[in-house]
Amino acid sequence: MKPNRIVMKVYGKYALFTDPMTKIGGEKSSMMIPSYETLKGIVSSMYWKPSFNWVIESVKVLNPIRTERKGIRPIKYNGGNDLAYYTYLSDVAYIISAHFEFNKRRPDLQEDWNENKHYYVAKRALEKGARRDIFLGARECPAYIEPGDMSEPGYYDDKGTLSFGLMYHSLCYPNQNDEGNLYSRFWHPQMENGIIHFCRPEECENTIFLRKGTKKELSNIPILGVDKEELLSGYQEGGELQ
């Protein structure tokens, strides 16, 4: 077991993990399971720093997969309203297992590669319910998180193997690859007795080029770690300047 692993439960009344195939037509429909990128966003909302990246290991689906259609009046680009039907997942709950790895593309933040510090800060953030608001795919689908356990009983515990075909996995941003391009990744997920084990982003079987991107320039501001003596230089106990 990885020492920096976090296991959380996330749940909400509705979820909208929009299928890219339905996004263009205006009537969104949710994928049946959350994508890697969605879960990474949920965990990052709990706690994130640019010095490390979250890696999603697996997710357990606790409740039956059910959908519900809603009539929505989205705002038109030129004003006024339109009528559309969105298909949501209803009464969703998941157990997410994830760990963090230090961002080797940010050597300027090497002083912040403190595993114990980030692990315990993330653990406290999880116990308090995250640092930022949690959403299940869309702003209108608020959710809540708490410490979880993969052994919690779920609806699909004895349902065997379920396949979901070719599905969206994640995005690869320009600052995450040497070419500086934006890519979309796809894979074939399978659920074994309610648990989906994710492949790493670089292991996805299908990668599609989207567009040429621009890498963000990194600053040369020196970063000090929390264990550096000079970090508190000039201060005395109580936080006051000497």
Model-found features: residue ranges?
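Residue-level signal for secondary-structure boundary sites
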Residues: 16-18, 67, 104-106
